[in-house]
């Protein structure tokens, strides 16, 4: 996955644009836009890399000498740097519109390096600016544009929009045996809709969502006229993939997470969203089925899920009642998952720098 970038305009976006001549060519013309410093700090903390991109009409000519541009620009950069704000690059087009150059926004020559080689996370990178040319630049780059307005979509609103978690994933898995559609919303709770055709399995999947503190919709059409094997197995694969995708870059998650008593049962679960699939499972049942679910498929479900979710999962339960033993495994997994997916900060919980 590429890096999240913010390509930010300067005049009218980071700093106020003088209405009389649209040039910040004196120190007394320099004024930061409201809330720009705390907003940029919050956006950096959320994992965005900042790039400044600006058109400076006629820079270096008699109409806009370099020596009048540099003092306010350098002071602006010093202020931002002193507050912990870092721009990876400052990209400037010095040409006039009449020059018909190839680098003036909304043309993309200045950002060519970001458009090649998968460097940029296209789905989570943005252009922020106060003019339609900034929005057109975003369109030309294939990313989203945010039109800055001090009285509307201002820095506080932009920061709220870009840092508010909305971790969602959709997986559609179709084979000769099953057709499965899964939607997962990790930052929403309640209202899950689950229909696998296996009633007790639906109830168990709902336990994961309820105790995991998230919402999911699962719709399955499987070859139940044979048995429940493919339905349960493929649901585990699709759900694990959806959970893994919804976690995204995993920045700030707890990663690890529990022990759960349920009546006479004691269920244990240890989870590491490690990127390494592995299952250790210990549970014994008296009967082949609980309701319409084969008890042997419980282990198979968690093995499939741990494989596609790329997590290390240890599950164990003891008890006397098969219904309680099965349910305790799904509940304890949900509670453990709640801990592991909870956002606790902004750093990646790995000394390797990758999960």
Curated annotation (Swiss-Prot):
Subcellular location: Cytoplasm
Keywords: Amino-acid biosynthesis, Cytoplasm, Histidine biosynthesis, Hydrolase, Lyase, Magnesium, Metal-binding, Multifunctional enzyme, Zinc
Molecular functions (GO terms): histidinol-phosphatase activity; imidazoleglycerol-phosphate dehydratase activity; metal ion binding
A Gene Ontology biological process term: L-histidine biosynthetic process
UniProt pathway annotation: Amino-acid biosynthesis; L-histidine biosynthesis; L-histidine from 5-phospho-alpha-D-ribose 1-diphosphate: step 6/9; Amino-acid biosynthesis; L-histidine biosynthesis; L-histidine from 5-phospho-alpha-D-ribose 1-diphosphate: step 8/9
InterPro entries, A to Z: HAD-like_sf, HAD-SF_hydro_IIIA, HAD_sf, His_synth_bifunc_HisB, HisB_N, Histidinol-phos, IGPD_sf, ImidazoleglycerolP_deHydtase
The enzyme's E.C. designation: 3.1.3.15, 4.2.1.19
Region: Imidazoleglycerol-phosphate dehydratase, residue numbers: 167-355
HAMAP family, alphabetized: Bifunc_HisB, HisB
Protein name: Histidine biosynthesis bifunctional protein HisB
Organism of origin: Pectobacterium atrosepticum (strain SCRI 1043 / ATCC BAA-672)
Organism placement in taxonomy: Bacteria, Pseudomonadati, Pseudomonadota, Gammaproteobacteria, Enterobacterales
């Amino acid at each position: 996955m590429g890096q999240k970038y913010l390509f930010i305009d300067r005049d009218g976006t980071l700093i106020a644009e003088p209405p009389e001549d649209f040039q910040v060519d004196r120190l007394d013309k320099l004024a930061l836009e409201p809330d720009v410093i705390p907003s940029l700090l919050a956006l950096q903390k959320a994992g965005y890399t900042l790039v400044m991109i600006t058109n400076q009409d006629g820079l270096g000519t008699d109409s806009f000498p370099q020596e009048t541009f540099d003092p306010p620009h350098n002071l602006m950069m010093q202020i931002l740097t002193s507050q912990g704000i870092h721009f990876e690059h400052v990209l400037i087009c010095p040409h006039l519109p009449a020059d018909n150059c190839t680098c003036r926004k909304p043309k993309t020559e200045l950002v060519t390096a970001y458009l090649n080689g998968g460097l940029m996370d296209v789905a989570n990178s943005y252009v922020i600016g106060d003019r339609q040319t900034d929005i057109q630049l975003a369109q030309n780059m294939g990313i989203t544009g945010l039109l800055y307005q001090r009285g509307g979509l201002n820095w506080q609103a932009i920061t709220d929009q870009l840092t508010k978690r909305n971790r969602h994933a959709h997986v559609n898995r179709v084979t000769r045996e099953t057709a499965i559609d899964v939607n997962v919303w990790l930052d929403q709770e309640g209202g899950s809709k689950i229909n696998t055709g296996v009633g007790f399995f639906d109830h168990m999947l709902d336990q994961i969502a309820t105790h995991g503190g998230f919402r999911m919709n699962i719709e399955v059409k499987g070859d139940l006229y044979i048995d429940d094997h493919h339905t349960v197995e493929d649901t585990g694969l699709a759900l694990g993939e959806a959970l893994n995708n919804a976690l995204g870059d995993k920045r700030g998650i707890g990663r690890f997470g529990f022990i759960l008593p349920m009546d006479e049962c004691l269920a244990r679960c240890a989870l590491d969203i490690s990127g390494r699939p592995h299952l250790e499972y210990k549970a014994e049942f008296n009967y082949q089925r609980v309701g319409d679910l084969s008890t042997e498929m419980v282990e198979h479900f968690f093995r499939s899920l741990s494989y596609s979710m790329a997590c290390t999962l240890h599950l164990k339960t003891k008890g006397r009642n098969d219904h309680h033993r099965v349910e305790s495994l799904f509940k304890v997994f949900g509670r453990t998952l709640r801990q592991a997916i909870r956002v606790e900060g902004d750093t990646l919980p790995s000394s390797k720098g990758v999960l």
